[in-house]
Amino acid sequence: MQVCQTLQNYLYEPHAALLKSGAFKLIATRLNLFKLHRHSHLYTSESLCQDFPGRIFTIEETYEFSGKLLKQLYRHIPKANLTTRNFPLTVAELRKRSNIKEGGDIYLFATTLYSGQRVLIRTHKTH
């Protein structure tokens, strides 16, 4: 299993069945993907891997997480689909603090990178 040092162009979120089966290490190795963090179960790659069993997103921007960022983010992203992986706040807590409404074409992933840095990753669905 390879762990990424920096985010690349694409973000991969495995189907729930894959996570429950425990095959998340195998899929990363076979498809040459980099894991964001040991406990995040999110992956990244430079080039698109269309065979991935799950959702694929194109990374648009990455924000370093802070309380100040949450308050400012609503002005730029009033509506988004939020997901958390290996992150101290729940989706409900993030929504409450940021006032970002559910829906739209933007997907925000709140997660922790291998370095321990907490980030929000702005993406749009690719596949």
Kindly give the residue locations of the regions a language model identified.
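SAM-dependent transferase fold signal centered on methyltransferase-like domains
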Residues: M1-H127
